[in-house]
Amino acid sequence: MADRRTERRWLEQLTALPTAPGVEHRVLAWVEAWAARRATDLRIRSDRHGNLLLTQKGRRRRAPVVAVAHTDHPGFVVTGVDRREVEVEFRGGVRAEYFDGARVELFDSDDAGHRGRLVAYDPESERGRVQLDRTAPLVPGDIGRWFFGGKRGGVGERFALAPACDDLAGVAAALAALDRARGEPELSHFSVLLTRAEEVGFVGAIGAAKDRTVPEDSRILSIECSRAFPESPLGGGPIVRVGDASSVFDHELTNLVSEAARVRELTHQRKLMAGGSCEATAFVAYGYRATGLCLPLGNYHNMGNLDEVEQGKGMATPLPEVISISDFHGLVDLLLAATEAVDGTWDLTQRLESRFESRKHILG
């Protein structure tokens, strides 16, 4: 079982990998290599959409608990190359202001980075043109991201700064929890599903839900990184997410997770997080019991100074994303606590009956 230091190393390695919707191969390869080193305990398979499912070997005595995280992040995909002129499309949600003359880094098949400047971008078609600093062996299908200069960051004692915390920090947390669960009989039903193309409408999750990539009786813990706000700050603990902009999640499952965090005195927050929709919505829509867990995220989708930009006051500067290290470790702990807790019952009626009996005299 890995220690906290090793888990932070996985976090640093994963969140530094270039990825984009539909071209997540670097992340998937990292995970496959990680799983291969644990082949005595784990199985790994890919569904027809390219999502990866990691399960524990041995007999399962309870319905699965599946932590779901996505392997993509908003990014550029090369569509054409003419010497130093590179045509790109952008996949994911970023405000138009951040594209104006931005520096970017495109990666070839050997993982070498090639820098350039975005000289044209149409937010309607989400297509643009990059002028490279020098010619490079790029081909259609290669991917890119913002170039942060000396601000790429790393994992420190308090914070992690990285190109893609969303949702590769979630991937790291899910794998860390799975690594801890190995060999623990009471956690043998914990597994991990890593999805693709979340940033363009959680397409991979929809495919997994439609095809029943995980059994119908699975309990889904959908992991996200969600924009931090004053009421959901970095360092306040991982968030038990009761719903999103599209749906409210399974109330009993959500309450069981919250109660597990409370009983174990795990620092956490409980919020709706209605700023967007997440993969839990897809699983709920297709009949699964699902709830959400998320990490508060600074510089959401690499949009630095976002609050000021939204108010028309700040400079739209692409920056590395930021999460709290204590939130990250707390999420790993919460995943395992939730796995043990979800087979319980949440009987609110009994509590209300007791309250009624003790206070009904007030009604006269």
Give a label for each model feature.
Residues 1-364:
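N-terminal hydrophobic/helix-forming segments and targeting peptides
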